[in-house]
Amino acid sequence: FDHMKILGDNLTQIAREKAGIIKENGNVVLYPQSEEVEKVIEDAAAQTSSRLFKADFASIKLKSFGIDGQIFDYSTFTDLKIKLLGRHQLKNAAVAIAACQVLKEKMQGITDETIRKGIAKARWKGRMELVCKEPIFFIDGAHNEDGVKVMVDTLEEYFPQNRKIFIMGVLKDKEYSKMVKTVARIAYKFYTVTPVSERALPAKELADVIKMYCDNVIICDKIVEGIERAAEEAEENDVICAFGS
């Protein structure tokens, strides 16, 4: 629901705006959505005489995962490897593969092997990006409730027994209270920072909100202070994640 002032305030309106990019006689590759959203996309594809392809999430089979990546099967592919972490990235990979399979019809050089290699080489800066292993330190661009839920789910799955430490900074126009409530459920400690922006929420104000859910909060004057203190004060097996906007 980001950018609601521009796209609309409900899923149907947002989908209709997004569907505006569909061109006549084109190809549409869809990440499976709710029934109401898919109806909008299907109608737009029909109106523009475009072919619609939908990734088949039911054919995804996760085989192994760890901080260095994941191995999974999808459709006719076996033992695909990706560096991106989290089950949601398997779905993103499935959509990318579906798009490549459509492009194979028009572009020479795209083969199952090049798709396999491309998926393995894919990187996404700031999306559960591992920047250090000692201590384990991630940065994630989660800046809304949905993004934070995905981040929390990933951390819980990968590190069920580890203490989780968060460095958080947000803009004051974000729904940060909802974000805090979601993260606090798994948090051992927070370091709050003030983003470099005129719209930034001061670290102290963010800390006041966090204290409603977690007593272990440290206010930092600068972002670099939050990073340094979190890294220095982390104990063995602690996991640090910096997120926000």
Predicted regions and their residues:
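Acidic, Mg2+-coordinating active-site environments of NTP-dependent enzymes
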Residues: 1-76, 93, 97-116
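Nucleotide phosphate-binding/pyrophosphate-handling subdomain across enzymes
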Residues: 2-3, 10-13, 76-189
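Generic structural signal for well-ordered alpha-helical scaffold segments
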Residues: 19, 101, 152-156, 227-232
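Short, surface-exposed connector motifs at secondary-structure boundaries
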Residues: 19-28, 158-164, 186-189, 235-236
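C-terminal helical cap/extension that packs against the catalytic core
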Residues: 31-53, 68-71, 136-137, 145, ...
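Beta-strand->loop->alpha-helix junctions that form or flank phosphate-binding loops
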Residues: 31-32, 44-66, 83-87, 114-121, ...
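Acidic, glycine-rich flexible loop segments
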Residues: 242
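Active-site-proximal loop/hinge segments that shape catalytic or ion-binding/gating pockets
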Residues: 245
